[in-house]
Each structure stands twice: as C-alpha cells, then as structure tokens.
Amino acid sequence: MENLPFPLKLLSASSLNAPSSTPWVLDIFLTLVFALGFFFLLLPYLSYFRCDDPPSPSPGKRKCPVGRRRRPRGRMKNHSLRAGRECPRGLEETSDLLSQLQSLLGPHLDKGDFGQLSGPDPPGEVGERAPDGASQSSHEPMEDAAPILSPLASPDPQAKHPQDLASTPSPGPMTTSVSSLSASQPPEPSLPLEHPSPEPPALFPHPPHTPDPLACSLPPPKGFTAPPLRDSTLITPSHCDSVAFPLGTVPQSLSPHEDLVASVPAISGLGGSNSHVSASSRWQETARTSCAFNSSVQQDHLSRHPPETCQMEAGSLFLLSSDGQNVVGIQVTETAKVNIWEEKENVGSFTNRMTPEKHLNYLRNLAKSLDAEQDTTNPKPFWNMGENSKQLPGPQKLSDPRLWQESFWKNYSQLFWGLPSLHSESLVANAWVTDRSYTLQSPPFLFNEMSNVCPIQRETTMSPLLFQAQPLSHLGPECQPFISSTPQFRPTPMAQAEAQAHLQSSFPVLSPAFPSLIQNTGVACPASQNKVQALSLPETQHPEWPLLRRQLEGRLALPSRVQKSQDVFSVSTPNLPQESLTSILPENFPVSPELRRQLEQHIKKWIIQHWGNLGRIQESLDLMQLRDESPGTSQAKGKPSPWQSSMSTGESSKEAQKVKFQLERDPCPHLGQILGETPQNLSRDMKSFPRKVLGVTSEELERNLRKPLRSDSGSDLLRCTERTHIENILKAHMGRNLGQTNEGLIPVCVRRSWLAVNQALPVSNTHVKTSNLAAPKSGKACVNTAQVLSFLEPCTQQGLGAHIVRFWAKHRWGLPLRVLKPIQCFKLEKVSSLSLTQLAGPSSATCESGAGSEVEVDMFLRKPPMASLRKQVLTKASDHMPESLLASSPAWKQFQRAPRGIPSWNDHEPLKPPPAGQEGRWPSKPLTYSLTGSIQQSRSLGAQSSKAGETREAVPQCRVPLETCMLANLQATSEDVHGFEAPGTSKSSLHPRVSVSQDPRKLCLMEEVVNEFEPGMATKSETQPQVCAAVVLLPDGQASVVPHASENLVSQVPQGHLQSMPTGNMRASQELHDLMAARRSKLVHEEPRNPNCQGSCKSQRPMFPPIHKSEKSRKPNLEKHEERLEGLRTPQLTPVRKTEDTHQDEGVQLLPSKKQPPSVSPFGENIKQIFQWIFSKKKSKPAPVTAESQKTVKNRSRVYSSSAEAQGLMTAVGQMLDEKMSLCHARHASKVNQHKQKFQAPVCGFPCNHRHLFYSEHGRILSYAASSQQATLKSQGCPNRDRQIRNQQPLKSVRCNNEQWGLRHPQILHPKKAVSPVSPPQHWPKTSGASSHHHHCPRHCLLWEGI
C-alpha cells in the first residue's frame, strides 16, 4: 500500500484505523477496486470493438454498436478480490508513465498551461473526453473520480502537495464530463501498457512523406487506440461515441496527456533533447510500420492542407514555440518542392506516357503537388479551421484513396478516349466554320482557365442546332480533382506556370487524336462556352500522332483507311450554299423550342453514332462514280471532291427535302459526309453504274463492300480489278441462287436489291401487260437483263428475267384476280336465272375460252381453279339437257348455287349446245366417263330428227356396268311400294334417295345412270315404276341418286304443261316406256310369291288405288297392242312424252318432303292394259335370248310397229339383269358367315321414330337402298310360290307383302344369303359407313306398324 497515490492512502488508512467506520466505506472501496480490476481484464477484448462510423450531422451522439458485456452481480462480487490485487499494480504503472511525461515536458508544463488545458470545454464538446480510467456508475460519489484524475498532476508519487494539482482544474466541467459519461455511455477503456493495439494506431493524419523517418508518421501513445483514417474522418479515441472531425481539425477537448504525448515525436524530429527519444523508441517503430500502410492517406492529406496545419494537428500548435513552427513549415515546403521537381524530371518523353494508366498517375501526382504548394504558400490558421469544420464543401473531404483512384481512373479514361457525353455537350473538337474560313490555328486546350482565343468567325445564320455552351464543371464533382477550381487558395505564379507547362506538354497528346476524328469523318462535336477550338497541328511536329491515331481507330473504330491519303489531315471545307446551315428540323415543325432542341440533339447523336456505316456507303458510291472518270481530268478542271459532288447532287431535288427531315442539309458541313448524302435521283446514278449497284445485292457482296477499300482512285488497274471482283461475286451468287429462282423462291436480299434495281431499269422492261397474263406459263417471256447483266451467262439472264416477270405478275395481278372471282360467280348466278333466250345468247365457245383463260391464270398464280372448274361443270350440265327445260328447272338453279367443293371428275371437253331452231338434235360428239380403273362406257348419240318417222341410232352397249343395273333394279323394286302408298301414309314418309359420297367414280356412276335414260334411250313402265336416277347436289356438297315413280310424275305434271310439250319429246318418252316394260317383264317371271302373304295383301288392298279392272284385261291380243302403240305416237298422246322428259330433267332437283297421291287418267289405263298383255304373253310363251332377239334389239330404234320386237327387247333386258343379279349373289356367297351375326335381329330393329337420332339423311338414304335390295333378293329366292299365287293377287301387292313377310322372317327366307345389303362386289365403288350397323327402312317400318 505504500506505492498507492495519496487519496487511496487516506481512504485505506481511514478505513483501517477507524474501526467504528460505517460499512459503506468498505463497500465503496471494494467496488472501486473491483471496477478497476474488471476493466483491466476486459481491456484486451474491448480493444477490438471500436466505433468508426462517419461523422453524424445531427447534434446528438451516436452510440457505439459494441456494448459492455454485463455479468450477473453475483459473479462480479466473486471476482472482486482478484481485481483488488491487480489494481495496485496498474496504478503503479500509471504513476510511472505520468512521471516520465512530466519530466519530458519540463518548462512547457506550468500551472497556467495546465489550467488552460483542463479548462471549461466548448458548448458542443461537453462529455466528449474521458479519463484514463474506467467510468463510474451513476450512483457513485464525485470524489471517486479523484484517484483517476490525481495522477495526471502528480510528477512524483512522493509529492508533498498532491491535492493542489487535483484541485486546480475547474471542478464543474471536469466532474460534469465524468458523471455524464458514467450515466449515459458504456465504458471505453484503453489498452494497458503491456497490451499494445493489434493494429497500427493512427490517431492523427500523418505529415507528408519525407526522407526523415521520424516525419513519416506520428503515432499516439499506446494507452489509446483508434482505427485508421477512413473517409477523411478523425475519431476521438477517448470515448466510444463517433464524434469525427474533418481533416485539418483537432478536437479542442482532448485530455492534457494526449496533447503532451503527441508533441513528443514532433519535437524530437526537429532536434529536441535525446532523453525523450529513448522513451518513445517503441512508438517510432510502430510509426514506421504504419507509414507504409497509410502512405496514400498521407499524400492525400498533404494535397489538401498546408504542412503547418498538418504539423499542428500532430504536434499541437500550443506546445510548439515560434521557432519550432517555422522549422516545421520550412521542412514541409522543401519537401513539396522536391516532389515537384522530381515529377518534372520524370516527365521525359510523352510518347511513353500515352496509355491512360501513365497519364492517370502523372496527373494525380501533379494535382497533389500543386495542391500541396498552394497550401504551403497560403496557409490557414489552425484555430480558424476548427470552427467551420462541419461546413466545408464535399470535395474538400478526401475519401478512401482506392475509391478516389478508381473514380478518377474512370473519369480520366472517359476523358482520354471520349466522354459519354462527347457527342452532345462535351469538349471541343471542331467548330462550325463559314465558307471563307479554310485554315484554323488554335492553341491547345487549357483546362484551368478560360480561353480567350476564338479563331472561328461566327455568322448570324448559325444553326440553332449549335449546342449551348457548357463549362467543363458539368462533368460532375468527381472531375474537380482534375480540373481544380477551389476558391480557397490561389497558386503562386511559379506553381501556375509549372502547371500550365505540364498541361501544355501533356494535352497536345490528345490534340492529334481529334483532328483525325474530325477531318476523316467530319464529326462536329458541340462546343463549350468560350472554348471553340480546332486542332489542326502539323503531323511533323508530333511524331507520336500516328500511334495515337491507330489507338483511337482501334477503340472508336474509325474507318480512316477508307479516306484518301491526301485528305487525312486536311481541314478544307467544301463550298456549301447558305441553306446548308439551316436547322435539321423544318422551320414550321410544330414543336416547342425546347423540344426542338432535344430532337435535334437526339438526331445529331444518332447520326454521329452511325456515321461509320453511312460513310462506308457513301465511300463505295463515290468510288463507283470515280471509276468512270479520269482523276487527272477532274483535277485539271478543278472538279470538287467526292463529298462535294455527292452533296451537290443531293441538293438537286429540293422538293423532296421539303417533305422529310433534312438530314442531308445538316448545319455541319461535314455532317453530310457522315450521312453519305445518297443522291436523291438514285435512278439516274444507278443508270450510270448499274453493275455496281447490283453488286450490293447479295449479302456476300455487302460484306465485301463493308471492308475498307484500299484502292487509289487514280489507278485504272485497281478499278478494273475491283470491277472484275464484283462481277465474279455476283456471278457466283447468281449461280447458287439460280435453282431457287427457277423454283419460284427468291432470297430476301435479292428481292430487296431487285426492287431497288427496278427503279433504275426502264419501265417497259418490267411492266407486265394485261393481255399477256398466260405468257409466263410458257417461260418464254423474260425481262431484258442483257444490258444490265451483260457479264452473266445467257441462260442465267433468261431465267432471272422470267422470274422477275412471274414475280411482278403475281404481285400486280394477285389482288385483282381475287376480287374478280366472286364477281364472276355472282354473274353466273344471275345468268342461271335468265330465260331460255338469254341463256342461249352467249355461245359455249365463249364460256369455254373464258374458263380456259381463268384456269391458265389460276395455274400461273398457283391457285386452285375452283371458280373456273365450277363454270366448266355448269357448261357441261347445260349441254346434257334440253335448253327448254334448263331455264325453267329449279334444280338447275340449285345446282349452280352448290358449294365449290366439286371434284374434278369430269375432264372431257364440254358439249356445245345445238344452234337455235334445232332443239331436237343432239351432237354426236362421244362422251367418255371414267368409272373405275378400266371400266369405261362410250356411246354415241345419233342425231334425232324432229319428225315422227325419223329413226335414231342409239345402241346401248352390253358392257353396262353392274353398278348401274343394280342401282336401277334396287330403285325399281323399292318404288313398288312407294308409288302406291295411301295418302295418309305418304305424308309422313320421305322420298327414298341413295346418297353417294364425293368419290369421283361414284359421281361418274350417277351421271352414267342419268345418261342411261336420256331422251329417246329408255322408257318407264307403269307396272314397274322405274327410277330416273339423277345427280342431286345436296346443300352439304354431296350427290344423291333420286328415284321417281312414273305414275306419280304423271299425276304431278299439270295438264296444261303436258299439252305444251313438243312431239319429239313424246317419242322419247314412249321409247322409255317400252324399255322399262321389257325389263319389268323379265322380273315378273322371277318374282317370289309367298302364299302366306295373301291375307296381309288383301288387308292392304284397300290402301292402294285399283290397278287392274279385271283379269280379262290382262290378255289382249297382239293386234290390239300394236294399235295402241301406234296410238301412242299420235299428237293426242303428246303429254306422255312431256311427262317423261319432265320427270327426267327434274331428277336433278331436290325432292319435296311430301308426295302427292297419284290420279288415274285415260293414259294410265291404256298403259296398264299394255303391260297386262305383255305379262300374259310372256307367261304363256317365254322367249329365249338368241342372236335373232339381240338383232331385234339393235334394230328396235328404227322399227316400233312389231310387238315381237318389243317383246324381244324386254326379254333381253330382263335376262341381262337376271345374269347380273346371279353374279352378284355368287360373289357374295363367301361372306355369309362374316355378316350372319350382324343381321340376326330384324332389319327394322330400331324404332322408326328414333331414326333421326341415329342416322343422318345420308344414312337413311343408304338404309332404304339396302332394305330394298335385301327384299328383292329374298323375293327371287321363292319363284315357285310366287307362281302359285301369281294369278290371285296383283303384282304390286304380292311384292309389298313379300317384303313385309321378309322383314318378319328374315332368317327363313335366306338363311345362307344374309349378305350385307351395302357390300358391293369388288369392282363396285364402295360406300362408307353402311356396313357397320343395322339398317332400317322407314317405309317398311310404317307398313309393319299398320299391319
């Protein structure tokens, strides 16, 4: 306890000698000891947690993020004894340190100085300084701070008056600062002497780097720690609050020992006593270590603040005498001068400092030296800077050197190679010049002062596009370190001269780069205010310019190689008219002035950015133009330069310039060079050199032209070589693309090029006349490209010309033809509604030629000739039927309105209608219909005479297809019931229609059926009402075979209409009657007769009209039959012919939904008697098919007076049908087992009222045909039973009942012949969708329900 300070001795003595003292004294002592020990224990750990935040602008203080690690109070009491033992040792070491400091200070420390140091703090600095010891808690008495403050004034532990020094400081502020720290802040301990800081301490900014190592850095005492400088701030180490001061300022509230200790290295470096050097040797070693780490900070600090200020920051001006201050100022000044001269000696040749890195280093060092010298010549007092420390501008605060270096490097690189805003508002590279200014002389750039030299003469007609002058300060504050404009100091004349010398020696390096940019490309950069300068220095004065030019070309892609060698550094400006200096935008452009300026700037930027490509294009055009001219002649005549010629050509068409943006007339004379100024009359120039224009067509040639053309314009050899090269390229390109061109394909580049070439070609070469549309189909017509592409092969020229014609024809006539087609179709619909005279007016030849021309045009345009095909079909259909029926038939109109989806199944040429007055005649031109692969039927229709006795030759071939016979037989069989239904039953039924799909063969088959029963070829029998099958075009584009009953047709035709028919048609109808009677006679002998059907037939007998009056009427003699046949040929029976013809022609129309009941007429009675006689004759005497009967059939068209001939004809037809039916049965006998399971159920298994839900209209038509065929096959299987009841009931009743019986017992009648009703033979055209489900007959179902 002997070594303790005086206050502790008194406290311990009083506590030990006074046993009656209260326990709180001991508690206070133990608490103090514990606090000290705990502080020293945590001191190494707390040294890592420092507050290095930037200065806060708010007056309040920001707490350090690191707080005290609080421990439970129980644990703290446990460690109180150990802390008490360590506390005396720490106090002893502290007293030793203070004694050394006191001995070092000597006479500088007196009572007045100490009082000044420890006096009241400024208002803003209260609480910012802290004692060396630990902080106290808020409930501790104020006298506890005495042991901490007393050692500061005690030079010796054995002093007699220790309390004098303790009482000398002002008690108020001192105690207030301590108490405020204790109450509001966590403790900020200092490192003990035996635990130095892990990082090199740097309390104050270091002085400039000098050879003297002591002047390199001035470290603080080891009792305090602070982080290195960051963001130009100084952090007070006495507490954890982040109270920072800018450079050049030092807190005035630092504790006395800090100032005293900090002054030791400065005094020793200036020649102080040697005693204190040994005491601070450890500090100097640490300072040398931190000198290298903080060298950049030292240099930056030197560049911004005077050396005296820096020295005062470290050495505290209050502790230095006037002599010491002078010595420090002299030393710093000499150091700055030495640095400046060293930099001057290292400048040397600027060719080695062309890179931005070297320039950056040099300029940075130059700026630092200039600032240091300025600070040296005009220093500021330390105490004046402290008051305004927080009001200094931003650039005065130096940031981290690495960040500053990176920012400066970025800005300088942009300045060296071209700023981002160089094309809009940056440095001056050129200026607008008048027509009289050709040579310019200007001084180099001066960045530190405004230039007063402006050699450019300005006129009042200057373009408003000239950008507003802007000083270099708009580049931002980051450029201000380079362009110094700080108003706080003025450089000395010597420093300014040196700076100007350095800048003048460095910036001419930049000057040669801009002339090449300006003079080669004509780029006019906007000017800054009072700095309009042009750089046109001779190349010989700066040998390093070629290197600069190459570097700039590599970075900016300057195509200077395209220019002529004699125009590289020329500054001559072409003689432009006055209007070339007008604005880019028209004067009457409806925009505001501000918006106009922005638009002009934007356009100017875009032009400058794309000047390279435009310059290449213009260069290539100029080279092409110069190849056709002699360079010597142009030079002798004083011909203007290529740029002048192109610009003068661009001015020729002034009318076009009034409409579009006048980019060609840019204010800058060189701007036209950038644009290339393509001549307005491009066609005239292309005619001058068409080969070269075509050379730009292909992509490969474009790539070649983009390459720099190095040829000299005065060399004819080079011109010939380039011409040959271009021609070879075009030849190779055309050879590769010739195949695609012949196929109709054209590359995009070729199309664009030819569109451009077409402007130069004569109009007559590419114009396609309207009368020669079909010419390209033959490939003979082509564009005359010989005069344009003479170097190409003849075949290549011909193919290319033909392709051009096709291309132009397609694009020129595509739209008109598409509009013309609907108009023609609309006209055809109108024509179809005309009368007979109007329809017969235009000849079919005209229609045929028109259709043919349309087909040719469609084929030429590669479009489906649907309209023309439809027109041909209509023409053929009009030839197939009489004109008298064509105009009045509604089926003809419906056929014309059918959809366009008609397949091309009729390829033969259409028949021409007979001339007027010969309606009865038909042409003898053969008609050929392709049914299946090899099955064809050809027949010739002889001329039919209008007279009654005239014969006609129409020999039906025996090669009638099986399909035709089968369809006719099925229709005839089904009509037996349909023709004689009751009126009530017929209302709910539909006409049976056999629908056929759009297969061309099936459509041919249907037309064959139609032509089979054309006028004069066949007759219908009343007993067997045969169907006159015809092609019906349904609304959905399908075709249907529509059968009709002859009795119904007779009853439906009005009598007045029957009287108006000619006699010639009556004969054809009679022939049809005879033919159908013969066919029916054959079928009568083989019809099945079932006795079980008698009852049902008798019950059904009242439903049908009477057919025969008596059995006796069925057996007339032969003479009576002949008389009746002769009577049929008389005019009084003319309605018969009209009835049959009308029925045949109306077979092309859609059937009505209802069927009118037939009416009995005298003609019907006569027909019935005829067929009764025929049936009785055949029953008694069947006639075999012999050669004589076949001969009779052939001569039947000429002789109709003999009944034997008619009987033979009917016998032959019936036998043929029988053979065909047996053949069909034999072929399908093998398919019984396959379809047996499908047809076990009755045919009408599905209810009739549900047929609309299961089948479409097409399905119902096929179902009826299938059921009819099945019923016919069944009836033929029972000939014996039919013969037994042949004379007991009428024929039609027998067939009807037979069909009903067959429907009831389908398995009994033909168990082995359950053939699919719609499965035709292999040579039949198959119908899809008919064999996968059960079919039903609506008519038979109705009969079944009635029974």
From Swiss-Prot:
Organism superkingdom: Eukaryota
Keywords associated with the record: Differentiation, Membrane, Spermatogenesis, Transmembrane, Transmembrane helix
Membrane topology: Single-pass membrane protein
Biased segments, Pro residues type: 198-211
Annotated Basic residues bias: 60-82
Annotated spans, Disordered: 55-88, 106-233, 374-397, 628-658, 900-955, 1084-1161, 1313-1335
One Gene Ontology term from the biological process aspect of the record: spermatogenesis
Biased composition (Polar residues): 165-178, 631-651, 927-948
Transmembrane segments: 23-43
Subcellular location per the Swiss-Prot or TrEMBL entry: Membrane
Keyword Phosphoprotein: no
Compositionally skewed regions (Basic and acidic residues) per UniProt: 1108-1127, 1137-1146
GO cellular component, one term: membrane
Stated role: May play a role in spermatogenesis.
Protein family according to the UniProt entry: Belongs to the SPATA31 family.
Protein name (database record): Spermatogenesis-associated protein 31A7
Protein species of origin: Homo sapiens (Human)
Gene transcribed to yield this protein: SPATA31A7
